[in-house]
Swiss-Prot record:
The chain crosses the membrane at residues 7-27, 64-84, 93-113, 132-152, 160-180, 185-205. It is found in: Mitochondrion inner membrane. Belongs to the ATPase A chain family. GO terms for molecular function: proton channel activity; proton-transporting ATP synthase activity, rotational mechanism. It comes from the Eukaryota. The lineage of its organism: Eukaryota, Metazoa, Chordata, Craniata, Vertebrata. Component of the ATP synthase complex composed at least of ATP5F1A/subunit alpha, ATP5F1B/subunit beta, ATP5MC1/subunit c (homooctomer), MT-ATP6/subunit a, MT-ATP8/subunit 8, ATP5ME/subunit e, ATP5MF/subunit f, ATP5MG/subunit g, ATP5MK/subunit k, ATP5MJ/subunit j, ATP5F1C/subunit gamma, ATP5F1D/subunit delta, ATP5F1E/subunit epsilon, ATP5PF/subunit F6, ATP5PB/subunit b, ATP5PD/subunit d, ATP5PO/subunit OSCP. GO terms for cellular component: mitochondrial inner membrane; proton-transporting ATP synthase complex. The gene is MT-ATP6. This is ATP synthase F(0) complex subunit a. One of its GO terms (biological process) is proton motive force-driven ATP synthesis.
Amino acid sequence: MNEELSAFFDVPVGTMMLAIAFPAILLPTPNRLITNRWITIQQWLVKLIMKQLLSIHNTKGLSWSLMLITLTLFIGLTNLLGLLPYSFAPTAQLTVNLSMAIPLWTGTVILGFRYKTKISLAHLLPQGTPTFLIPMIIIIETISLLIRPVTLAVRLTANITAGHLLIHLTGTAALTLLSIHSMTITVTFITVVVLTILELAVALIQAYVFALLISLYLHESA
């Protein structure tokens, strides 16, 4: 059992690359004017995501719509991919999530200091701060700014990993209890089904939360 759990985190690079590229297959670019139902659902989903993520932005901020929509769909589909039997979710790896969070966060910081230099610096010192607390507050606000990409990546990794491990442990318990009593396996099976449904919701919610936080960071900067 311990070997199975450790194998969950020890994934070959080739397998990870295939898992990352898989969402592109599920969302093909339509090459004709008359679309089918799948393309219609895809377009409706894109419009819904755009409406939710870009409601706080002005006209200038709308230029980030393609990136935010792509980010949401990519994370959501890779999270759902990990729920399939004998599959792997790239977002369960902290390195993958950091590789998304750090460049996006860096871009928001650069934009902020380029276009809103005074406002970006003002965020490091809240208005009305007592004089003797100014050095400490600046250090605290700077640290809170620098750990943003880490919190983004850790939040996504922790939620996806915890759900997968919980389902794995519950499923293993169901197989172990199978030889004890039939009623026990029934209760455990129902528990696994409920956990899977909850994990479906978590997979989609975490994709939305990740993209929403990036959108909020962009709103502060752009």
